[in-house]
Amino acid sequence: SQATTLPASFAEDAAAYPAAGCKAAEVWLTKLEKHLQEVTAEDTRKALADAGLALVAAAYQGGLLLSQGEQRKAHFDHFKRRLDLCQQFGIPTLVVVADFAQSPDAAALGRAVVSLAQAAQWAAGFGVRLALEFRGTDAFCSNLDTALTLVEQCGEPNAGVCLDAFH
């Protein structure tokens, strides 16, 4: 995962990972977005293919589950641009983080389930699966059980859970 090499650029990672024997990587989307400000998508895809490096997952998108109003619109617009990147680069899975800074009430939980379902529906249109990542430091969705419950309740076949061994 490029999360482990944040100080390096996307191009540096794209060269170093295969040199270290890695044939696949989880791309840090902010790195890819920054890289694409200077290098075309076509040239980037060619460089990845030449290096023998496949982008198998993308990290990560937040702000989708609980945001409302203009914030929700901004997060979903950003999400759709990232889905387009996933489609362009053949990245099959996008990691979504549960943005539960505070303990949610029943209305917020309902909104989170609906938002996850809507996000999964958008992702399906781009041929992308979503992987909901839970974190022990979150106020909610801090373990496998709550992540599985949210995914199950959203009812979308392309929504699943990310088991992140990094933290």
List where the protein language model places each region.
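Short N-terminal helix-initiation segments at or just after the protein's N-terminus
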Residues: 1-4, 103-111, 161
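Distinct, well-ordered alpha-helical segments
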Residues: 10-14, 37-41, 106-113, 138-156
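Hydrophobic alpha-helical membrane-association signature
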Residues: 78, 112-115
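Acidic/histidine-rich catalytic cores of soluble enzymes
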Residues: 24-25, 55-58, 117-167
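Active-site-proximal loop/turn and secondary-structure-junction residues that shape catalytic pockets
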Residues: 4, 29-33, 61-64, 98-102, ...
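Active-site groove signature of glycoside hydrolases
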Residues: 86-106, 126-136
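N-terminal pre-domain/capping segments
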Residues: 1-91, 124, 156-160
